[in-house]
């Protein structure tokens, strides 16, 4: 999220105007509250949109995407094309993604249980090799209220060559890719990519 405490304070000092995008109205409300706490409301536009149908009404100079957003999108090529369409020449695109290693070897067909004082969580995974995606089921029980939360979603697996090709196809130069947890060089067991790409030309003329 662009408005995590550290990033929000940095953007506030630098005077950036920001656009926050999510399909969830609930998440946008959380960001709106955070923006008010940081005094950023006047420089923040929140849009409820699908990244596959993006319309920003103008150009941008940078984009930041975290928490594996692009793994949740079945059409990576279109999502990157949309980001590129609205970005000015020289614009910076920063984003992270889970690696094939994490999907296949760490999540795989494994289940994880987490116990906290106020809640317990069971996270189940199934790797669908034919469709190259992880099918994930999350169940959370809140001890005090007895409330139960259930969610099912997929993460799609994209290898480095596919991501690089999509970036280059849509006008980006891949400046660097590193381990998204250590920020050191990638290894065979890296679980997260972190990408820095720059746009080579402007497509949308205002």
Language-model region placement:
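Single conserved hydrophobic/aromatic residue that forms the stacking wall/gate
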Residues: 1-8
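Class I SAM-dependent methyltransferase SAM/SAH-binding core
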Residues: 9-53
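A short acidic, Gly/Pro-enriched loop at the edge of an enzyme's catalytic core
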Residues: 52-63
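A short, glycine/Asx- and small/polar-enriched loop/turn
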Residues: 60, 132-134, 188-193
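A short His-aromatic
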Residues: 71-72
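A short glycine-rich, Lys/Arg-flanked "PGG" loop and its adjoining helix->strand segment in the class I
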Residues: 77-92
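SAM-dependent methyltransferase
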Residues: 94-166
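C-terminal lobe and adjacent flexible extensions of AdoMet/dcAdoMet transferase-like proteins
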Residues: 158-206
């Amino acid at each position: 999220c662009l408005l995590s405490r550290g990033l929000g304070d940095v953007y506030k000092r630098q005077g950036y105007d920001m656009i926050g995008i999510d399909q969830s109205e609930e998440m946008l409300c959380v960001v709106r509250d955070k923006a008010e706490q940081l005094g950023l409301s006047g420089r923040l536009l929140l849009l409820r949109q699908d990244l596959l149908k993006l319309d920003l009404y103008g150009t941008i100079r940078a984009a930041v995407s975290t928490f594996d957003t692009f793994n949740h999108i079945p059409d990576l090529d279109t999502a990157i094309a949309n980001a590129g369409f609205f970005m000015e020449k020289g614009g910076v695109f920063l984003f992270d993604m889970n690696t094939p290693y994490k999907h296949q070897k760490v999540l795989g067909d494994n289940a994880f249980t987490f116990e906290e004082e106020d809640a317990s969580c069971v996270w189940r995974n199934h790797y669908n090799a034919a469709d190259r995606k992880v099918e994930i089921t999350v169940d959370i029980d809140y001890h005090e209220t007895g409330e139960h939360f259930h969610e099912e979603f997929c993460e799609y697996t994209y290898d480095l060559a596919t991501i690089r090709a999509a970036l280059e196809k849509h006008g980006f130069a891949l400046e660097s890719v590193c381990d998204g947890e250590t920020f050191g060089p990638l290894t065979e067991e890296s679980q997260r990519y972190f990408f820095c790409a720059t746009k080579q030309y402007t497509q949308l003329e205002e």
